[in-house]
């Protein structure tokens, strides 16, 4: 039990020692770029392939029927994409 407590205390201290300190700007810059990834609001959304999802046209199979499942361009799925309205 004592070893477990010592291990937890050591890992907690290690986390605080290795945490990123924004005041250490020269230490976090590597060849003109940041060592750590940029904040979400600084990222380029056009660089992400996940933001470019194609939708399925009307009369094509869309899977399990859910309304607004995100697969159909119209938003209506009943095994095939149905027109909106």
UniProtKB/Swiss-Prot annotation:
Residues 20-53 form a propeptide. Residues 1-19 form the signal peptide. PROSITE patterns: OMEGA_CONOTOXIN. GO terms for molecular function: calcium channel regulator activity; ion channel inhibitor activity; toxin activity. It comes from the Eukaryota. Omega-conotoxins act at presynaptic membranes, they bind and block voltage-gated calcium channels (Cav). This is Omega-conotoxin-like Am6.5.
């Amino acid at each position: 039990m004592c070893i477990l407590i010592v291990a937890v205390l050591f890992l907690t201290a290690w986390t605080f020692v290795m945490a990123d300190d924004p005041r250490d700007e020269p230490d976090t810059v590597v060849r003109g770029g940041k060592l750590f990834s940029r904040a979400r609001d600084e990222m380029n959304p056009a660089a992400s392939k996940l933001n470019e999802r194609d939708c399925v046209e009307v009369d094509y199979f869309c899977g399990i029927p859910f309304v607004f499942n995100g697969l159909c361009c119209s938003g209506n799925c009943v095994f095939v994409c149905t027109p909106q309205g």
